[in-house]
Amino acid sequence: MEQARDHLHLRWTTEQHMPEVEVQVKYRTAALSNQECQLYLRHSQQQQVLVVDFQAKLRQVFITETPRCGKKPYWNNEEAESKQNPGSIYCLLLLIRGGMSDSLIKREISNFEIVSKNKKN
């Protein structure tokens, strides 16, 4: 009962202090001691978390695509660019610059990780 009251209070205060257009309350579920707890975040806070995760993922993908042989990476190679065959990092950055949605960015990063793992095997 107390949890439900807290939830209603949080929702009411968020809606009171912010214009309806800006209110994009999303929740994520965290498992704590075998109990599910919903954490409600403002859009700006959630975006901040996404950026941190995204930067870590991008760094990880970048490392897996950097060759260790001393040659220029193919995604930063003029010859590759002239053949219009840039690497996945370059493509991903273009998609982000083009206004790709957060969910699509996450999906694309997952696809790159799968491809990178398959290349190693």
From Swiss-Prot:
InterPro entries reported in the protein's UniProt record: SNURF
Superkingdom of source: Eukaryota
A single cellular component GO annotation: nuclear speck
Family that this chain belongs to: Belongs to the SNURF family.
PANTHER family hit by this protein: SNRPN UPSTREAM READING FRAME PROTEIN, SNURF, SNRPN UPSTREAM READING FRAME PROTEIN-RELATED
Protein name (database record): Putative SNURF-like protein
Provenance organism: Homo sapiens
